[in-house]
Amino acid sequence: NKLIGVIREQGWKRLFQIIYEVKINNLITKFVSIIFRRSGLKNIIVIESHNDFDCNGGAFYNYLIEHGYNQKYLIVWLLKKKNDIKLPYNVKKFLLHRPSILKSYYISRAKIFTSDNEVVPKARDDQKMYYFDHGSICLKNCKPFFNMSRKKIDYFFSPSPNYDAIYCNQM
């Protein structure tokens, strides 16, 4: 049993951490998504990046701010670490691995998701997920470790045309 394996290998504390950070978070998002499933999508962009405010997600965020897209879109950053950085108008931040009803609301209503590292599951089929790869992968079979699928990602940006066939094979 997978649950018993987690307890044996990582202990009860890690089990409760997984339940809190992942399972409760997903449950809240599913519940909020059910409530708003008939509501239209809003001009919300959800960004996740490898480290907070960096990689391709950071470059995309900088582009959005420099070109005033935060005037039309609410930009929601999903952070891995608590951060006291001051954000410009119409930009909000939430911890990726902490339950939040407001974060779940934004996830359930967002038009666009971007990710560099951890793919945040779309709540609805009419949302679009863009994956910005942040580097090259090893030239070996990564399929067992590649936690992405064509169901989760609508558009995949690779670092080079030379990697396109490799990525397509891995998904």
Which residues make up each language-model segment?
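Membrane-proximal basic amphipathic "stem/tether" segments
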Residues: 1-43
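Active-site and donor-binding regions of nucleotide-sugar-utilizing enzymes
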Residues: 43-171
